[in-house]
Amino acid sequence: MSGGSSGGQQREREILLVAHPGRAEITETARRVGKIFERAGIGMRVLVDEVDSTRIEPMDGMAADEFLVPGLEVTIVQAGPDAALGCEMVLVLGGDGTFLRAAELAQAASIPVLGINLGRIGFLAETEAEHLDEALGQVVRREYRIEHRMTLDVLVRVDDEIIERGWALNEASIENRSRLGVLEVVLEVDGRPVSAFGCDGVLISTPTGSTAYAFSAGGPVVWPELEALLVVPSNAHALFARPLVTSPESLIAVETVAGSHDGLVFCDGRRTLELPAGARVEVVRGKEPVRWVRLDSAPFADRMVRKFELPVTGWRGRKP
């Protein structure tokens, strides 16, 4: 069907496009992607706007009329658990926020996600906009590999009753709901109490999330090949409130003190869970990973230096 249509026969290969909305250069890039896939006989679905009240912000996508281009055939879909079903992958045009939106859809369909950075740092993206044609060529030829990134499963208990469930790719951030005063918590690891303290919040992160919010809060950078859980207190009022790195099989629990403030749990900064005073948050390794499209084998150190523009002048390296 022609651009903007929403029905038709599904092709053997189909890719879901999730793009940051509202920027002319991204719209033009998205159309370019569509034309390349059209020539290769690959169908393209395009995510359009849909508001979901359980999210902090809408699941933004392209407007349908942005693909009204003669000769360009796309399928318009709305955000939801079935948006990516049957697709080969989810392709992202944008920054890390757009990638995290797309990761929800990719995880729900158990398919990989490929990020093309059109944002600022874009740490989650696999490649930059200037390498778009090369990246799409590899996709067309199926010259890519898939890497599994661990996730977090999150639940909230009140008196042993589970009242909320969620998941995260980067981090679960436990915060004071009112942002006034101090959130009093007790940290538990594998069924044993570790420390009680007042704080602005507690971050529980994956290695993938170690370069995101946890990094800003003073946590360590963890190579994605290493499977672990990170616990990073935020502005804690305690002598011992250091970042911790635990086994990926650990159960991390944070109990809010009864009579303290109500809180919220932010999953990837996108999905919220209610946290009444006296409730308990439990975080474990997620059952369902996010599948990552890798186009090259560049070391993580090179990616980190490039994304953060780290100075390496004076490095000599080991002589062969």
Curated annotation (Swiss-Prot):
Listed GO biological process terms: NAD metabolic process; NADP biosynthetic process
UniProt cross-references to InterPro entries, sorted A to Z: ATP-NAD_kinase_N (IPR017438), ATP-NAD_kinase_PpnK-typ_C (IPR017437), NAD/diacylglycerol_kinase_sf (IPR016064), NADK (IPR002504)
The EC number(s) this enzyme carries: 2.7.1.23
SUPFAM superfamilies associated with the record: NAD kinase/diacylglycerol kinase-like
Enzyme class: transferase
Single GO cellular component term: cytoplasm
Cofactor(s) recorded in Swiss-Prot or TrEMBL: a divalent metal cation
Annotated keywords: ATP-binding, Cytoplasm, Kinase, NAD, NADP, Nucleotide-binding, Transferase
GO MF terms, alphabetically ordered: ATP binding; metal ion binding; NAD binding; NAD+ kinase activity
Catalytic residue list: 96 (proton acceptor)
Cited Pfam families: NAD_kinase, NAD_kinase_C
Family from the record: Belongs to the NAD kinase family.
Function noted in UniProt: Involved in the regulation of the intracellular balance of NAD and NADP, and is a key enzyme in the biosynthesis of NADP. Catalyzes specifically the phosphorylation on 2'-hydroxyl of the adenosine moiety of NAD to yield NADP.
Protein name as catalogued: NAD kinase
Species in which this protein is naturally found: Rhodococcus opacus (strain B4)
